[in-house]
């Protein structure tokens, strides 16, 4: 792994000189190995170690380099054709591979090669980008998007139209992380490497980036970039210092209780392949 990382780091420093027709075989092989590892879930752009999230920047670099090494090619998809550098994850899947994967893919859902889909995941007509990790039992509902390298935990519900930001453009230091058992309400957006800790609930229409104020009404505290475990968050606003206008914020209104769980719990009947 150390050798692989060194090849990727060196290639990234030399990325301006890489192209589909000009790249050393060692670089091609290293990038292909990383993409295959991401696709199978053996590698992750970010992982939780001793309770803290660590970003593997070299893996993210490999994803970026992969775009320099590939030409666009035509891809068939139902009645349509596509033209891109990254193949789809399921383009050459056999029925046996789908059964072995243990997930469901509802047309016209798309996942790119280099993303990982765990067992009992349901992909409604949605989009999962390269480098993303979607863990077991998660529902990605209709028109939801999981951005490049985003990390989605177990038993998460991403409601219709949810946007989970990626890291490739604009380039972000770390991916968005949605931990286990999180519920994200319809049309909400989480971007710019924000972390939503386990068991949190975001209501419909909550938008959180690194500069979004997260106001806890119980304590009056304002934080940024992380929603604490078990928080229930709704959209709100805070007044300006001069009282002349208000600006958007996310408001922690309470902690998850039995009533909240009854409204946001997953339906086991919908899981399983």
From Swiss-Prot:
Protein's UniProt name: 2,3,4,5-tetrahydropyridine-2,6-dicarboxylate N-succinyltransferase
GO BP annotation list: diaminopimelate biosynthetic process; lysine biosynthetic process via diaminopimelate
Molecular functions (GO terms): 2,3,4,5-tetrahydropyridine-2,6-dicarboxylate N-succinyltransferase activity; nucleotidyltransferase activity
Keyword Iron-sulfur: no
Spans traversing the lipid bilayer: none
PROSITE patterns associated with the record: HEXAPEP_TRANSFERASES (PS00101)
Catalytic activity: (S)-2,3,4,5-tetrahydrodipicolinate + succinyl-CoA + H2O = (S)-2-succinylamino-6-oxoheptanedioate + CoA
Family: Belongs to the transferase hexapeptide repeat family.
Principal EC category: transferase
Subunit structure and binding partners: Homotrimer.
An annotated GO cellular component: cytoplasm
Alphabetic keyword roster: Acyltransferase, Amino-acid biosynthesis, Cytoplasm, Diaminopimelate biosynthesis, Lysine biosynthesis, Repeat, Transferase
Location of the protein in the cell: Cytoplasm
PANTHER family cross-referenced by the UniProt entry: 2,3,4,5-TETRAHYDROPYRIDINE-2,6-DICARBOXYLATE N-SUCCINYLTRANSFERASE, MOLYBDENUM COFACTOR GUANYLYLTRANSFERASE
Keyword Acyltransferase: yes
Disulfide bridges in this chain: none
Phylogenetic placement of the source organism: Bacteria, Pseudomonadati, Pseudomonadota, Betaproteobacteria, Rhodocyclales
Residues reported in the UniProt entry to bind substrate: 104, 141
EC number: 2.3.1.117
Superkingdom of the organism of origin: Bacteria
InterPro entries found in the cross-reference section: DapD_Trfase_Hexpep_rpt_fam, Hexapep, Hexapep_transf_CS, THP_succinylTrfase_dom1, THP_succinylTrfase_N_sf, Trimer_LpxA-like_sf
Pathway(s) per entry: Amino-acid biosynthesis; L-lysine biosynthesis via DAP pathway; LL-2,6-diaminopimelate from (S)-tetrahydrodipicolinate (succinylase route): step 1/3
Name of a matching Pfam family: THDPS_N_2
């Amino acid at each position: 792994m150390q050798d692989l990382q060194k090849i990727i780091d060196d290639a990234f420093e030399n990325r301006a000189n890489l192209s589909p027709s000009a790249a050393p075989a060692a670089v091609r092989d290293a990038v292909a190995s990383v993409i295959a590892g991401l696709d199978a879930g053996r590698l992750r752009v970010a992982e939780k170690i001793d309770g803290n999230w660590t970003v593997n920047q070299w893996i993210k670099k490999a994803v970026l380099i992969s775009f320099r090494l590939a030409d666009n090619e035509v891809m068939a998809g139902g009645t349509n054709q596509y033209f891109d550098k990254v193949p789809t994850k399921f383009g050459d899947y056999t029925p046996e591979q789908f059964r072995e994967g243990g997930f469901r893919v509802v047309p016209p859902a798309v996942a790119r090669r280099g993303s990982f889909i765990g067992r009992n995941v349901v992909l409604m007509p949605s989009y999962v980008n390269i480098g993303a990790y979607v863990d077991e039992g998660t529902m990605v509902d209709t028109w939801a998007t999981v951005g490049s390298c985003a990390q989605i935990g177990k038993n998460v519900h991403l409601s219709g139209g949810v946007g989970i930001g990626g890291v490739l453009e604009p380039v972000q230091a770390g991916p968005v992380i949605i931990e286990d058992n999180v519920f994200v309400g319809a049309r909400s957006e989480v971007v710019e490497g924000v972390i939503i800790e386990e068991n949190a609930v975001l209501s419909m229409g909550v938008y959180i980036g690194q500069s979004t104020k997260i106001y806890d009404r119980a304590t009056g505290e304002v934080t940024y970039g992380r929603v604490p475990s078990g928080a229930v968050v709704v959209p709100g606003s805070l007044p300006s210092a001069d009282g002349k206008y208000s600006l958007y914020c996310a408001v922690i209104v309470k902690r998850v209780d039995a009533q909240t769980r009854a409204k946001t719990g997953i339906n086991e009947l919908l899981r399983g392949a």
